[in-house]
């Protein structure tokens, strides 16, 4: 039986089409995925992300533990509330999960991990935390709502009290603050400004209804996927998994190679991969009629005349741009164009950086 978030009833009241998403009943859309997508790009939309797992870590050696557990380096986190995006890797350099870590105090950090990877993440974290004496608390008492779009922060702020408004005033991206019973973070998965707000389960439904009344449009998983793909943001199990290096998933920037003496899980394997080279993640744009879909082959000939083949990891029609876009994992040596096989047709595509839209504007 699939689990329900505390907002399940609100979704049905809003007319959602519900689907099973990794064991959770979640809204796919509320009538029009396209309208929901455009609401986030032009105004404000919101997503129930209560299926995500919030994990609090406490103990005097928490920073030391996270410097070992994660490929990015929490030594960078010196200001309370600052957040960091990182891969959590296995010994062979594959990605167990991608996550966000928040620093509050020297003995208190918070992780937000994916729902699909919840059980293996918790098992891995618990196993490696034991020698460090870390106290692990899974915050199943909290729901989370992501409010995203150019007007999202202003509309969400109409629900805040004076102290909460003051707490978030001037807050830069990738920060979080506990303000009353709300944990408000300037993070998201859409390429737009906004907040991800964690709050007690029993208060979630009222908060959701108040956001609807403030003019924030409920949005489902369909729009969440097209928005994150336009923004060039990875989806676990598509762009990366335990067999794929972060170097092949456009996550090289999340690996803190320095200081060279920091030992983190997967480091040795990553250094070998860096030396020998890996595949890479690129963007694809197709302005011809048709849609680039997951798992379609991507073919190109390198400058030496050798033929290569890669694969589309995520593809869709972009509502913002009006044509098809994709992320693809391909061998090194790809040029500015490639061919994608769609049924029995060879379609030309332009190769770009793996990001297409930022703050509502095309970058590809």
UniProtKB/Swiss-Prot annotation:
GO terms for cellular component: cytosol; glycine cleavage complex. GO terms for molecular function: aminomethyltransferase activity; transaminase activity. It comes from Shigella dysenteriae serotype 1 (strain Sd197). It catalyses: N(6)-[(R)-S(8)-aminomethyldihydrolipoyl]-L-lysyl-[protein] + (6S)-5,6,7,8-tetrahydrofolate = N(6)-[(R)-dihydrolipoyl]-L-lysyl-[protein] + (6R)-5,10-methylene-5,6,7,8-tetrahydrofolate + NH4(+). Belongs to the GcvT family. Keywords: Aminotransferase, Transferase. HAMAP family: GcvT. The glycine cleavage system is composed of four proteins: P, T, L and H. InterPro entries: GCS_T, GCS_T_bac, GCST_C, GCV_T_N, GcvT/YgfZ/DmdA, GcvT/YgfZ_C, TrmE/GcvT_dom1. NCBIfam families: gcvT (TIGR00528), PRK00389.1 (NF001567). This is Aminomethyltransferase. Its EC number is 2.1.2.10. It is an enzyme of class 2 (transferase). One of its GO terms (biological process) is glycine decarboxylation via glycine cleavage system. The glycine cleavage system catalyzes the degradation of glycine. SUPFAM superfamilies: Aminomethyltransferase beta-barrel domain, Folate-binding domain.
